[in-house]
């Protein structure tokens, strides 16, 4: 792969990662399809995907830095105003409770989960995840019990963490699982999305660090320019995607995202089968 071609591939995959990582559409499904079409597969490709995920995570940190600092007791300026009443009740305990179920299962079954990374499993996960989004929209309480982040209870945070375990199934979508779970637990669509983003920071940083440690040997100095382009592209695109998504869900439901997942599942079938 020539230098210019590799940088173009990196930029394309960075855009795909940044656009899809925090939307309920499965970044894994998109990366598998696009990587296959671009002929970028194998151990280097897997390491590259891990690195550009860090770019997406950094975008969340930049977008929610005040809230993240607030969780550890460091406050800047006036209190944050979020969707619903802001009473300053969201704590680090909520985040920890949301992490525990997936962390435990992920550590216990890490190798088994990695073995599920194949097109057919991703295809099925896309469909089931889409059905869950539809179920969440249809079955959610008429009036959310937690309209804002600071109205969430510990129980709701833990149950969202249980739903997050579904995302260990490659292609399911971590944000899709957590947002759907939050809505079914009575958290508003907007607050569930915000909590999903906040929960992503420690969850994805931990998972990415573990994957990077295990795949570091596949990274060479010649890969650095390509990895840097992918990282920066994913960061910039994720910033725009997160901001746009949070504005969009104030006006529309998740049904269009569910339909889109079914289309991507069909695309996986066409490309790989």
Swiss-Prot record:
Pfam families the record matches: BacA
Gene Ontology cellular-component annotations: plasma membrane
Any single GO BP term: peptidoglycan biosynthetic process
Main location: membrane
Molecular functions (GO terms): undecaprenyl-diphosphatase activity
Other facts: Bacitracin is thought to be involved in the inhibition of peptidoglycan synthesis by sequestering undecaprenyl diphosphate, thereby reducing the pool of lipid carrier available.
Protein name: Undecaprenyl-diphosphatase
